[in-house]
Swiss-Prot record:
InterPro entries: NA-bd_OB-fold (IPR012340), Ribosomal_uS17 (IPR000266), Ribosomal_uS17_bact/chlr (IPR019984), Ribosomal_uS17_CS (IPR019979). PANTHER family: 40S RIBOSOMAL PROTEIN S11 FAMILY MEMBER, SMALL RIBOSOMAL SUBUNIT PROTEIN US17M. One of its GO terms (biological process) is translation. Part of the 30S ribosomal subunit. Keywords: Ribonucleoprotein, Ribosomal protein, RNA-binding, rRNA-binding. Belongs to the universal ribosomal protein uS17 family. This is Small ribosomal subunit protein uS17. Gene3D superfamilies: Nucleic acid-binding proteins (2.40.50.140). It comes from Paraburkholderia phymatum (strain DSM 17167 / CIP 108236 / LMG 21445 / STM815) (Burkholderia phymatum). GO terms for cellular component: cytosolic small ribosomal subunit. It comes from the Bacteria.
Length: 90
């Protein structure tokens, strides 16, 4: 028998951190554009995800990539995989 290597393709999304008030958790706002079926206009749809941040390193305004994982709590099934762009401090 052949030993097959199991490769799992986990979903990844890119979004903006809108809250880091929870311990080891950030709220990430993910926006995507969808074409309206009747009018043809592109509409921005958004959804918020709770993502695991083990070291509490990400701040509000950071652009991060999140990756799907096993359920970590009732509302948290994503982890922050990397920082895409840090927030500008004015």
């Amino acid at each position: 028998m052949n030993d097959s290597v199991k490769t799992s393709l986990k979903r990844t999304l890119v979004g903006k951190v809108v809250s880091n008030k929870m311990d080891k958790t950030v709220t990430v706002l993910v926006e995507h554009r969808v074409k309206h079926p009747i009018y043809g206009k592109y509409v921005v749809r958004s959804k918020k995800y709770h993502a695991h941040d083990e070291a509490n390193t990400y701040n509000e305004g950071d652009l991060v990539e999140i990756q799907e994982t096993r359920p970590l709590s009732k509302t948290k099934a994503w982890t922050v995989s990397r920082l895409v762009e840090a927030a500008r401090i004015i």
